[in-house]
Amino acid sequence: MRSTFAVLFLALIALTYSKNYQDVKEEIKNEVENEILRDLGEDDDELDDNAQEAVNDARPLRRFFRKFRGRKILPYMPSLINIWKAGKK
């Protein structure tokens, strides 16, 4: 009789555990997905920070020239060329 009760008790535990196992498995899966999404979000922030640092790592002279755009300088080019030509004469 004791062995029969032991087998039935173990079967009951096994059935209970199998239902809980599926729930636990789903919870773990959801937690892992959330962790992955959070890590990806943090990685995106780190990549943006690194890109900004790479721009700021330029030499001071290069940073000075990066500020100037062609549209700002282009209207003055004919005058600069004329002045340069006049200086050669």
UniProtKB/Swiss-Prot annotation:
Expressed in entodermal epithelium along the body column. It is found in: Secreted; Target cell membrane. GO terms for cellular component: extracellular region. The keyword Membrane applies. Its main location: secreted. Residues 1-18 form the signal peptide. The modification Alanine amide is found at A86. Antimicrobial peptide with a broad-spectrum antimicrobial activity. Keeps its antibacterial activity under a wide range of salt concentrations that mimic physiological conditions of human blood, which is surprising, since Hydra is an obligate freshwater animal with nearly no salt tolerance. Does not affect red blood cells. This is Arminin 7519.
